[in-house]
C-alpha cells in the first residue's frame, strides 16, 4: 500500500509561511493584491478562480477581477493588461488560458509585465525556469509538484525522473525544475516508443498526460513516487487523475491522490507568488 502524498499537509505548511510573509508586508502598510483576468465563462476557469479567491481571503491577500466577454477584441484585452500593469496596488496577475482562438495568445501573454507574471506564462519567466536563474516565477502547477517533493523529503539527486507530458505549462517546466534538483530527467509524450518500459525505469514520475486513468499498472513498479497532475471527470462523474489510482496505489511507494493532491497546493503556490511579488516590489526579503 502506497504512502499518500496529501496536498492538505503541504498546503498547511505553505500557508503558514505565506501568513508570515503577509504579516511582514502588513507591517509596512502593504496589502498584497492579485489581479484576475478572465475572458469568457469556462467552467474550469470559474472553478479555479473560486478556489484562488477563497485562498486569497483566507491568507490576507486582496484581489480584483477583470472579466471580459468571450468575443472581447484583442485591443480590449491588451488595454486590460496595460491597466493591471500600471496599477500600483496589483502585485501579481492571473490570466486564464487558453484564450479564445481569435486572439493572438503569444502577443497578449508577453504584454504582461514580467514582474507581475506570477504563473510563469511570459517568455521571460519561462526563460528563467529553463536557465535556472532567479528573476521570474515558475508556473504554479509544476511548482506545486516540487513543493510536494520538498515537503515529503523526496531526494531527487541522482534519481531517474520521468515527466509524462511536454506542455509548456506543466511538463517542460517540471522537467527543468527536476534537473535543477539534480535528477536525471526523461520527458515522455505521445510519440514515445515503448513508454511503459521507459516509465518503469523511473524513481520519480510526474504525470501530466491530460487523459483520465491513462497510466496503469503496466507503467509502474515498486519503489516509485508518483505525482499525478491530472484533473479529469470520469464516466461516473467523479474527479480522477491521469493515473489509474486503483492500479497504482498497491504497487508504488508513494502517490498523490486526485482529488486531494497537487490541486490544492497549486492554489497556495499562486498566492505565495503574489505575496513574493509584493515583497520584491517593496525591496523586502523573501523569507
Model-derived segments and spans:
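Short, well-ordered coil/turn residues at beta-beta hairpins
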Residues: 96, 208-209, 229
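Anion-binding alpha/beta catalytic cores of soluble intermediary-metabolism enzymes, centered on
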Residues: 92-156
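Glycine-rich phosphate/diphosphate-binding loop of Rossmann-like nucleotide-binding domains
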Residues: 39-53, 136-225, 234, 238-246
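Short, well-structured alpha-helical segments in soluble
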Residues: 76-88
Amino acid at each position: 500500500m502506497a504512502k499518500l502524498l496529501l496536498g492538505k499537509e503541504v498546503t498547511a505548511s505553505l500557508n503558514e509561511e505565506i501568513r508570515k510573509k503577509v504579516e511582514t508586508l502588513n507591517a509596512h502598510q502593504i496589502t498584497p493584491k492579485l489581479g484576475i483576468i478572465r475572458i469568457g465563462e469556462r467552467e474550469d476557469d470559474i472553478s479555479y478562480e473560486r478556489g484562488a479567491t477563497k485562498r486569497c481571503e483566507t491568507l490576507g491577500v486582496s484581489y480584483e477581477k477583470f472579466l471580459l466577454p468571450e468575443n472581447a477584441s484583442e485591443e480590449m484585452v491588451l488595454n486590460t493588461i496595460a491597466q493591471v500593469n500600471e496599477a500600483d496596488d496589483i502585485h501579481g496577475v492571473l490570466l486564464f488560458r487558453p484564450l479564445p482562438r481569435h486572439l493572438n495568445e503569444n502577443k497578449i501573454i508577453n504584454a504582461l509585465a514580467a514582474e507581475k507574471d506570477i504563473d510563469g506564462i511570459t517568455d521571460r519567466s519561462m526563460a528563467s525556469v529553463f536557465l535556472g536563474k532567479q528573476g521570474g516565477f515558475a508556473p504554479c502547477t509544476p511548482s506545486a509538484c516540487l513543493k510536494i517533493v520538498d515537503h515529503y523529503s523526496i531526494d531527487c539527486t541522482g534519481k531517474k525522473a520521468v515527466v509524462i507530458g511536454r506542455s509548456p505549462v506543466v511538463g517542460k517546466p517540471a522537467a527543468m525544475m527536476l534537473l535543477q534538483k539534480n535528477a536525471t530527467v526523461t520527458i515522455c509524450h505521445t510519440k514515445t516508443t515503448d513508454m511503459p518500459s521507459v516509465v518503469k525505469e523511473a524513481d520519480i514520475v510526474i504525470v501530466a498526460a491530460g487523459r483520465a486513468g491513462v497510466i496503469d499498472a503496466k507503467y509502474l513498479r515498486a519503489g516509485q513516487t508518483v505525482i499525478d497532475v491530472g484533473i479529469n471527470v470520469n464516466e461516473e462523474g467523479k474527479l480522477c487523475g491521469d493515473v489509474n489510482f486503483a492500479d497504482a496505489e498497491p504497487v508504488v511507494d508513494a502517490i498523490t491522490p486526485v482529488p486531494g493532491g497537487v490541486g490544492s497546493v497549486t492554489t497556495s503556490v499562486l498566492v505565495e507568488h503574489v505575496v513574493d511579488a509584493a515583497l520584491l516590489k517593496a525591496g523586502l526579503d523573501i523569507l
